[in-house]
C-alpha cells in the first residue's frame, strides 16, 4: 500500500495553506464548488454521498477522499457499495499529471481513465468539469450524459485564501461548465442543457430550506 500523505503535490498545497497571505495565482486547482450549485446538481442526479476530490474542508458529501488518500488509487465502486447506495461527486483538480512512487495522483487524462474503469464496475459518478472539448482528456461519448450549463458558473475561493492586497480581493472565478454523468445504467439522452440561473436559484432555495428549524429537527 502506497502512502500518499506526503507527496510533493500535497506538500505544495500545505505550503500554500500555511502562508499568511495569498495571491490569486496561488489558488491553482483549489477553487471550491458553490454550495448552491452542488445542492441543485444533487437534487437532479443524486443522492451524492461520496466526494472524490476534497481537501477535507470543502467536501460536499458525508464521505470523501482527500489528497492524502489519492482518489486515483481507490476503488470508488466498492466504496459506494460499502456506503450503501448513492453516487459520487467530483470537481476534479486540473493540475498537470504527477506521479508518486509510480502511481498517478493528478492529471485529467488519468482521472478520466480511472472514472471510466470505475463506471464499468458499477455506480454513478457525477463530474463538474470545465467545458474543454478540444482537450485530450475530454471523454466525449464515453460519458453517458453531458449536461452543458448555459452561463458561466462562479466558483468560490478556498477556505484558506487570505488576500495579500486589494488586487487579490475577488470572491469568485467564473468558468464555462458541464455536468458529466458516468453511469452504465443511464437511460436518458446523451446531451442536455441546463440554465445557470435556474440551477443557482434552486440551490439557494434548497439552502434556505436546510436553514429552517423544522428541517433541522427532522434531520436530527
Each language-model region and where it sits:
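Class I S-adenosyl-L-methionine-dependent methyltransferase catalytic core
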Residues: 2-220
